[in-house]
Each structure stands twice: as C-alpha cells, then as structure tokens.
C-alpha cells in the first residue's frame, strides 16, 4: 500500500510540473496572439484597398498577358504556411492535409514551397519533395520575409517554370475559428472583373504590370503570413488551455485516489492496533 502511495505521489508531482509548463505556454500564446491580431488588423485596411486596386489594374490590361491569361505552363506551385514550433493542436496537420488533398489531384504537375519547420517535416515523412523551404519566420512577420518568398515564386512564374501560384494557409477568423484556405494568386482570376474606366494609367498599364504584380504578390504573402501566425497562436493557446484543463482533471482524480488509499491505510492501522489491544486483555 505504501508503494502505491509513493507511485501516485510521483505522478501527482509530475503532472503538477507539466501543468505549470502548459499554463505558462498558454499565457505566452495569449500575449503573442494579442500582438498578432493587432498586426493583422493594422494591415487589413491596406490589404483590402490593394485588392480593390489590383482588380481595376487587371481589368485594364490590354491583349495577351501572362498575369491574366497564364503562361502556358502546366506546373502548379503550392506555398504552404505552417509553424516552426509544435504544440499548436491540429494547426500544422490541417494545412498540410489540405495541401496534400489538393496536390494529389495532379501530383505530377505540382510543386511545393514550404514555409515553416513543421511543414518541411510533414512533407518529408509523406515523401513529398519541396523545391524551397523557408524556416524561422518571426512571430511578427516582416515585409522582407514576404518579399523573399514572393520574389522566388514570381521568378519561377515569369520564366514559365510554373503556371500557377497557390497559397495554402490558415485564415484567422477568431480565437476559436480558423479556416484553411487555398488561394490562387497568379494568374489573376478575371471572372466578373470588368474595366470601368475609373482609373487612367500613365504610362500604359502593360508597361507597369510586372512591377505592380511584384508588389501585389508581396502584399498577398505578407497578409497570409500574418493570418497564419495569428491562427498558430490561437491554436496553441487553445491546445495549452485544453492540456491544463486535462492536467487539473487528472490531478483531481489522483488526489482522490491518494486520499482514499491513505485513509484505508490509516483505518487498517487503527484496526490492527485495536485488535492487538483486545488480544492482550
């Protein structure tokens, strides 16, 4: 019985230590999420305005153009956005599963550019090759990081090595809801886009388009990185809160078992003492 008490006591101590860690990590994730949401909200106005401008710009492009009509390549690029660290619930698995599900439809003509350590690990285990890997993205992504990724992807597109650029990321909706999105950013989706003549271009738009597309793609990547980081921290906060709750439930159960065994041991000792005293009469 004493051995059983010692074992339970050790488990209680171990789970208590684990709870301290999960609680601390949950608090850190909450703080980091607050910053991530602030950055996302600050960028939203610029991103939305730029999206509207790009629709007008793309509608004003004259004749055949690779950014509106495609470049003839069958290869599709998928840029997947995962985290560098773990312990964030199903965040990484959901992104990779969505990417793999889409890629499996035409694996022969699909290429992967992985953002985040976890994505790289997932694809390696699933035996999917990647053409580029970007890791150690900051919790507060920078335009420089977005530019590095977007320039690489755009270079491949301009050279005709890929015919589509798709981003697979987790869109932040709220602390408890994030949606996995697969968005094609190039070539532009011209459906329902018509030139309304509200913008005049000087010089002609076809002379400006390559530079505009570079800025547009960087803006897209930056927005997706911000969404991804906010989603990551929300998932981590939820996972750590759940782990802390589970630890509390385990501790309640173990403490109850410990007290029952201890009470039983004390009762047995009292019974033995009383029995011994009775025997001596």
Curated annotation (Swiss-Prot):
Keyword Acetylation attributed: no
Pfam families, sorted: ATP-synt
Record-linked InterPro entries: ATP_synth_F1_ATPase_gsu, ATP_synth_F1_gsu, ATP_synth_F1_gsu_CS
Entry's Gene Ontology BP terms: proton motive force-driven plasma membrane ATP synthesis
Cystine bridges: none
Membrane topology annotation: Peripheral membrane protein
Keywords in alphabetical order: ATP synthesis, Cell membrane, CF(1), Hydrogen ion transport, Ion transport, Membrane, Transport
Subunit-structure text: F-type ATPases have 2 components, CF(1) - the catalytic core - and CF(0) - the membrane proton channel. CF(1) has five subunits: alpha(3), beta(3), gamma(1), delta(1), epsilon(1). CF(0) has three main subunits: a, b and c.
PANTHER family in the record: ATP SYNTHASE GAMMA CHAIN (PTHR11693), ATP SYNTHASE SUBUNIT GAMMA, MITOCHONDRIAL (PTHR11693:SF22)
Protein name as annotated: ATP synthase gamma chain
Organism per entry: Clostridium pasteurianum
